[in-house]
Amino acid sequence: RDRSPSRGLGDVYKRQILLAVTAALAITGCSQNEEFEAPSQKAEINFNTAVTRATELDIDGLKSSGFQVYAYNTKAEEMSATVTLSTPWINGSATYSDSKWTVSGGPYYWPLAENLQFFAYSPKDGVTYTAPNGTTDKGYPKFTYTVGNTAALQKDLVIASVANAQKKTNEAATDVSLTFKHALTQVNIEVTKEAGYTYTISKVELTGIKGSGTFTYAGVNAGTWTAGTETSVSYAYELGAFSDDKTAVKAGNALMLIPQALTDAKISIEYTVEKDGSKIAENSKEVSLTSTAAWAFGKKILYKLTLPIGAQEVGITATVTGWDAEDPVTPTVD
């Protein structure tokens, strides 16, 4: 579609200077970071990408799923919580084909010495995006999102934003670099058993969890989550096999969940214990997570459970870090 200055771009400079966008999905801990040079100096938008999930998103996954990007022209105003966002200057789906990225509805052109505000996310499906209407609310856009019911259906939602990008008069245009960040909380569970006993674990489940929420952009590559108000849901977790009395964390099996306060959250676990081929205990236990840290945007958490043989308390620890490392949480299992 023709997006030249004669087609409603307002004060866009008549020299058709292409907007080149670099989508550098620089996800913490990702070893695949690709830099792409703009293939030409024309007006066509080009994207660069690098990624890490449902297995963690990787570069091939991003090329397959693409991403959604919005841009707003705020003229002389810089982005803030009080700025009014007009009709999107760009509202497009970025797709990868023939070794390059293109955005639907393009090409797009730089306005001279005016501020463009960029907001992007991936995957494109499952997101309901809302920009402030400029009358009853202003400032940053937001979107609602619901995670899948199982780990296999959950995707590694990532977001990016760039504030106040400009093409100055008599200066060459530079790429707009979108640095994507993980927007969910990644959750894993590890179990330690008593040595010398055989444990058969039939159920591990996170309960009292909000499955949807609203993400509001705030600043560059930042934002806040508000958990949904719907009835809490449960998510089954699949443990890895025992090795040296401890379960392994299975690759690609992490839960990707909405960041939230753990007001009613619990881990439910059912297991039997055998000794020398004879069953000696059958347990159904719950571990409260209310005293552990809230789930934060872009964090990775590991809950480490110590399961007793019988009617003793289950120990638990928890740690939280950025996406590149996994912190254990060790709560007590009653």
What are these regions (language model features)?
Residues 203-260, 272-278, 284-289:
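Contiguous ligand/interfacial binding patches
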Residues 1-13:
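Single conserved hydrophobic/aromatic residue that forms the stacking wall/gate
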Residues 15-16, 43:
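Short, intrinsically disordered, charge-biased short linear motifs at domain edges
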Residues 278, 283-334:
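Hydrophilic extracytoplasmic domains
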Residues 17-24:
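Sec-dependent N-terminal signal peptides
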Residues 32-200, 205, 233-244, 248-251, ...:
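Short, low-hydrophobicity acidic/polar segments
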Residues 27-29:
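C-terminal motif of bacterial Sec signal peptides marking the signal peptidase cleavage site
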